[in-house]
């Protein structure tokens, strides 16, 4: 028995020695530099809006509503939104320039703890060639993350995701917008939401983007434009209330 143990020890010693002198199969020839950046100033750039909503939520106390509207300036600058959707009771938690990234960061304030019968989501600012812009696939991934959070908190509440709108101001993003819209429409059943296409009413019979439905900045909708949006979105919300 002692001889067997000595033999096993000898074999193990040889194997260990070979392992110590063996040539590694993977060799790292270069060091990849890692630069850590602090995105806090960017992600919290609209803290004034968030602080306002935090105070508003405490003031309201009753956070029940027929529809919770979430999103960026196209929702925030909708001056007639409460009149347009009357008699539905709305709560709006939007701010100009919002992206899905800071909406995820501010989720607890703008989206959690409410009692909506339905939710409407519109946000378009993640795309772009600017410093903080992302491509269409990344934008869609951010949508999926935000939608997943909503579905976790409101599993039985109808969620309506509105398509990204075309505009002359963001004409360079049109291809990416179309791709994101196609992915959102295709993903609707899998994630359990309803996709609402508002782009179809924004073109004339010749297929040209209408200019009479935008403000002078050629980016945001004017009153006529919001009438078109209301005509498409409101029936969905009215049907939920029934």
Model regions: which residues?
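Short amphipathic alpha-helices and their capping/turn segments at secondary-structure boundaries
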Residues: 55-66, 104-113, 149-151
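Conserved beta-strand elements of the Class I
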Residues: 68-70, 91
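Short hydrophobic segments within beta-strands
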Residues: 70-71, 162
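Oxyanion-hole/transition-state-stabilizing segment in secreted/luminal serine hydrolases
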Residues: 75-91, 102-140, 164-168
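Conserved beta-strand segments of alpha/beta enzyme cores
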Residues: 89-91, 158, 192-194
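Generic structural signal for well-ordered alpha-helices
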Residues: 107, 143-148, 181
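Catalytic His-Asp segment of secreted/periplasmic serine-dependent ester chemistry enzymes
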Residues: 166-242
């Amino acid at each position: 028995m002692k001889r067997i143990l000595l033999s096993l020890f000898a074999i193990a010693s040889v194997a260990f020695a070979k392992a110590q002198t063996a040539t590694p199969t993977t060799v790292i020839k270069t060091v990849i530099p890692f630069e850590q950046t602090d995105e806090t100033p960017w992600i919290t750039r609209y803290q004034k809006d968030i602080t306002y909503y935090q105070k508003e939520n405490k003031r309201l106390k009753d956070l029940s509503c027929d529809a919770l509207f979430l999103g960026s300036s196209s929702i925030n600058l909708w001056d007639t939104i409460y009149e347009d959707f009357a008699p539905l009771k709305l709560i709006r938690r939007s701010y100009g320039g919002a992206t899905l990234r800071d909406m995820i960061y501010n989720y607890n304030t703008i989206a959690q703890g409410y009692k909506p019968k339905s939710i409407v989501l519109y946000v378009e600012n993640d795309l772009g060639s600017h410093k903080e812009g992302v491509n269409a696939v990344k934008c869609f991934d951010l949508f999926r993350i935000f939608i997943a959070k909503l579905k976790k908190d409101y599993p039985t509440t109808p969620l309506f995701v509105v398509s990204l709108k075309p505009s002359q101001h963001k004409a360079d993003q049109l291809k990416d917008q179309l791709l994101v819209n196609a992915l959102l429409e295709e993903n609707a059943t899998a994630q359990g939401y309803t996709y609402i296409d508002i782009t179809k009413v924004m073109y004339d019979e010749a297929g040209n983007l209408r200019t009479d439905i935008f403000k002078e900045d050629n980016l945001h909708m004017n009153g006529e434009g919001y009438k078109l949006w209301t005509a498409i979105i409101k029936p969905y919300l009215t049907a939920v209330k029934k």
